[in-house]
């Protein structure tokens, strides 16, 4: 089947990595608009820990993304950098916090979302422990949720896992740990899209990092002059979001439903720079 014909025959899940500040939200809007004009998008998940000024998420920025068609927002280490986020976490389960934070932490780190076509998509939001602040074991946390869904007879049609981590080795290990039990495991946090999208031996799709959506000419979102000043002088510099051209990075998952279940037929990286 020709590529264009296959693209139109599938339903698509759009996975967007760290959306950085106002430029990231604009890039998100432009990117989703372009993808939706070419494919039938049924579900969109983004990492929103940098939505508000590059640090954290608040009600205004989250709602702006939901108005664009975003289904679920995952987060990471900057989750609590904005006021009012606890109310957001306790609202409706559409903004997740890292699953392997303390059980006393407000909000939830996983959810099952029912689409208009009846498809049930599970999302897990994990955070790494290598070169990151202390947290509970992400491997055990993932096992608990997946086995819990299975024991209750509510396992979703497919599961997506956002592993928000610094170390590629830790992400890779999680990929193999979950292989065959989830549809896709992808990394966020480093803001650099990696070129290692592949299907693991057990059938799960894996990507080390989806990449940044935000200012293209920046140091992972920050204005270059600010980042350079800090690196060269060791003197803390004001945190300033970069400007100019917009970069949009995403992972696209084309899914089909048959009598044998739901499966990912096609996975591809998407990267575009908007003027």
Task: Locate each region found by the language model.
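Acidic, metal/ion-coordinating pockets
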Residues: 2-275
């Amino acid at each position: 089947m020709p590529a264009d014909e296959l693209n139109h025959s599938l339903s698509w899940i759009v996975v967007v990595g760290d959306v950085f500040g106002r430029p990231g939200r604009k890039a998100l809007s432009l990117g989703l608009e372009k993808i939706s004009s070419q494919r039938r998008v049924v579900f969109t998940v983004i990492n929103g820990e940098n939505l508000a000024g590059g640090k954290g998420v608040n009600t205004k920025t989250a709602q702006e993304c939901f108005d664009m068609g975003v289904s679920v927002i995952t987060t990471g280490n900057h989750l609590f950098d904005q006021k009012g986020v606890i109310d957001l976490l306790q609202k409706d389960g559409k903004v997740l916090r890292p699953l392997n934070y303390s059980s006393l932490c407000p909000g939830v780190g996983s959810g099952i979302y029912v689409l208009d076509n009846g498809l049930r998509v599970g999302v897990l939001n994990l955070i790494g422990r290598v070169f990151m602040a202390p947290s509970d074991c992400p491997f055990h946390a993932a096992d608990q949720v997946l086995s819990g869904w299975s024991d209750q007879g509510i396992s979703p049609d497919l599961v997506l896992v956002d592993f928000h981590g610094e170390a590629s080795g830790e992400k890779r290990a999680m990929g193999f740990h979950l292989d065959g039990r989830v549809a896709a495991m992808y990394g966020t946090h480093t803001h650099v899209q990696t070129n290692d999208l592949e299907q693991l031996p057990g059938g799960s799709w894996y990507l080390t990092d989806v990449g940044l959506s935000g200012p293209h000419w920046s140091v992972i979102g920050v204005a270059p002059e600010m980042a350079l000043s800090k690196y060269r002088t060791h003197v803390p510099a004001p945190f300033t979001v970069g400007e100019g051209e917009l970069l949009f990075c995403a992972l696209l998952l084309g899914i089909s439903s048959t009598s044998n279940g739901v499966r990912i037929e096609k996975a591809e990286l998407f990267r575009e720079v908007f003027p």
